[in-house]
């Protein structure tokens, strides 16, 4: 009940934009703090068969019946490929400082490799997009890989299950740095590697959709106890080699920065029992530390080494040194918090899988009460204090890095029976961002080096396995006509960010 009363109070408070602008606004943050909003190629661009683009694993996966909740796909998405110039006007209308987007690997290298040819039309599209972003006074924050492996590499050698992916990714990154790095000063190698590896190779709920038959009969045959870790290992090596290339070949002249974007929930002990407190650590290690520990310390968390054993790949001494320190900043995506309850004994018949290797039952409910107000997406519950806790944890454990909150947002149902005029009144989203910005500000005051905050997402988009069933955007998109409408939250941000 406490969180409900708080949410109602905050909604009432932030509904008065003028009052918020006078009390809490962009000037409540450091002068160089960056506010932005985000997107991703497959979720936005559409035009999958235009401009020389080759297919990605998401083109394949989304067209398999039953993989996407509403049977949809990203063939058109929000048609950003054709509408980006007018769409970017919304970003400036909201007084944002930056625009985050990803480059589609298969739009640059349709066959995934340099030898397969560089697509000049793809280069031209992203050059134009970058120039349009900059011409509006916005900073481009560019992600090199956001889940969309070229299908050609999946067919050729199972992509991230093979060490061959390292060279091909570095070659692709090299093209991006060379063609766009004179204007792009903030690069992310990968977005949410944990989601990509756990979903794509553990549960099979993300492309390429692989898992063990004992996890699901609906997956492509895989190995949920091994493949997530193999894919993650090769991804980390690809990331580190790309960072080394950028630092050795481009950084001195282009004067940019490069990092990687992680994702994690925050976790709260289910009870005061010591076992549940230990479960919090294991939860963080398996979700966050899996990809953070190697780039900070040069190896996986000790808890993972202990529980996963020989299924967890080992770095050579040279690889450990390569991976360690391979970032200038950390992107951090946060959406929700869970309770962590220890599983004291692993059932003897339970077969290995990433999802159960941590010996933790993660839940948003305790005694039937949710940890916070539920979003439309079933796994998300609003718990803004968790963002502050995650930021403080990152500062303490991971050597006090520069951090950009690269994604933070909430969604509502895509309900076609609600008139658009009503659907635009997203007070819940305003409350969500207000709360999370307040806790971000508090973390900064406590010494966390948070450099920016990006909303997820810019406009209602294709949300992977959920399709178009939910709406995360600040801008409403009519799925029938693709016409754009500004939600109330977009006006709130315009006022909050007014200079």
From Swiss-Prot:
GO molecular function term, any single one: beta-galactosidase activity
Catalysed reactions, semicolon-separated: Hydrolysis of terminal, non-reducing beta-D-glucosyl residues with release of beta-D-glucose
Taxonomic lineage: Eukaryota, Viridiplantae, Streptophyta, Embryophyta, Tracheophyta
E.C. numbers: 3.2.1.21
GO biological process, one term: carbohydrate metabolic process
Entry annotated with the keyword Disulfide bond: yes
Keyword check for Disulfide bond: yes
Chain residues that bind a beta-D-glucoside: 43, 146, 191-192, 335, 407, 456, 463-464, 472
Enzyme type, top EC level: hydrolase
Pfam families given in the database record: Glyco_hydro_1
Ranges annotated as spanning the membrane: none
Organism: Oryza sativa subsp. japonica
PANTHER family: BETA-GLUCOSIDASE 27 (PTHR10353:SF65), GLYCOSYL HYDROLASE (PTHR10353)
Residues of this chain annotated as glycosylated in UniProt: 111, 361, 408, 414-415
Disulfide bonds: 211-219
Active-site positions on this chain: 192 (proton donor), 407 (nucleophile)
Similarity comment: family membership: Belongs to the glycosyl hydrolase 1 family.
Signal sequence range: 1-19
Key words of the record: Disulfide bond, Glycoprotein, Glycosidase, Hydrolase, Signal
Name of the protein: Beta-glucosidase 27
């Amino acid at each position: 009940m406490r969180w409900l009363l708080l949410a109602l109070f905050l909604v009432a408070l932030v509904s008065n934009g003028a009052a918020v602008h006078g009390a809490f606004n962009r000037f409540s943050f450091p002068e160089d703090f960056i506010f932005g909003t985000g997107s991703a190629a497959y979720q936005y661009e559409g035009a999958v068969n235009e401009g020389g683009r080759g297919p990605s694993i998401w083109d394949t996966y989304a067209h398999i019946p039953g993989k996407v909740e509403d049977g949809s796909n990203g063939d058109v998405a929000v048609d950003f490929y054709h509408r980006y110039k007018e769409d970017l006007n919304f970003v400036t209308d909201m007084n944002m400082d930056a625009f985050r987007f990803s480059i589609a690997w298969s739009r640059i290298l349709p066959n995934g490799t340099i030898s397969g040819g560089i697509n000049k039309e793809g280069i031209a599209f992203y050059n134009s997009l970058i120039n349009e972003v900059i011409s509006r006074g916005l900073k481009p924050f560019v992600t090199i890989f956001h889940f969309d492996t070229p299908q050609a590499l999946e067919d050729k050698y199972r992509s991230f299950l093979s060490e061959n992916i390292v060279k091909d990714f570095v070659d692709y990154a090299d093209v991006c740095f060379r063609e766009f790095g004179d204007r792009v000063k903030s690069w992310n190698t990968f977005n949410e590697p944990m989601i990509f590896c756990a979903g794509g190779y553990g549960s099979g709920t993300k492309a390429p959709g692989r898992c063990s038959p004992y996890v699901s009969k609906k997956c492509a045959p895989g190995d949920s106890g091994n493949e997530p870790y193999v894919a993650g290992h090769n991804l980390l090596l690809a990331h580190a080699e790309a960072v080394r290339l950028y630092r050795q070949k481009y950084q001195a002249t282009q004067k940019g920065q490069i990092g990687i974007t992680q994702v994690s929930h925050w976790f709260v002990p289910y009870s005061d029992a010591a076992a549940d407190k230990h479960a919090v650590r294991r939860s963080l290690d398996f979700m966050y530390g899996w990809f953070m520990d190697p780039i900070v310390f040069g190896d996986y968390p000790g808890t993972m080494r202990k529980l996963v054993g020989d299924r967890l790949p080992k770095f050579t001494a040279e690889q450990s040194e390569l991976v360690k320190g391979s970032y200038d900043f950390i992107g951090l995506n946060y959406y929700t918090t869970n309770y962590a309850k220890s599983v004291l004994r692993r059932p003897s018949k339970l077969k290995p899988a990433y999802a159960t290797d941590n010996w933790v039952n993660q839940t948003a409910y305790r005694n039937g009460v949710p940890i916070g107000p539920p979003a439309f997406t079933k796994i998300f519950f609003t718990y803004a204090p968790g963002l502050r806790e995650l930021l403080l944890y990152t500062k303490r454990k991971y050597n006090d890095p520069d951090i950009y909150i690269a994604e933070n947002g909430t969604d509502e149902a895509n309900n076609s029976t609600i008139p658009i005029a009503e659907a635009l009144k997203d007070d819940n989203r305003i409350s969500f961002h207000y709360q999370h910005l307040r806790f971000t500000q508090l973390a900064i005051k406590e010494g966390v080096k948070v450099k920016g905050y990006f909303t997820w997402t810019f406009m209602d988009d294709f949300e992977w396995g959920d399709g178009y069933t939910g709406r995360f955007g600040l801008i409403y998109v009519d799925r029938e006509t693709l016409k754009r409408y500004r939600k109330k939250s977009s006006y709130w941000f315009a006022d909050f960010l007014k200079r």
